[in-house]
């Protein structure tokens, strides 16, 4: 009986050691993509090159979550003087983020109040009040 237990322990130890030696990459970790169709780089029109989409994981507002997250992220985008948003896009963003007309007025006012191309010093305080 003892030899049987010993054999079982040896076998299970060997199996675990073997299993640990095979690296498994979970699909959500960064790394080379799975083999499939090769990615063809999109050809952009000269002068209209888009900025690469920022990852959601780098977004500080993700910590806020909830419904407020969408409002704050939309306001942030609308207030940022460096982002070029057409009036139609502004309307779509405001509608999808459920912003009130007052929020839009404040966003437009803040956007015009910053000539230097960076958000105003009071930006976090203003967002906290909304």
UniProtKB/Swiss-Prot annotation:
One of its GO terms (cellular component) is extracellular region. It comes from the Eukaryota. It is found in: Secreted. Its main location: secreted. Keywords: Secreted, Signal. Residues 1-19 form the signal peptide. Component of the acid-soluble and acid-insoluble organic matrix of calcified shell layers (at protein level). Expressed throughout the posterior zone of the outer fold of the mantle. This is Uncharacterized protein 4. It comes from Haliotis asinina (Donkey's ear abalone).
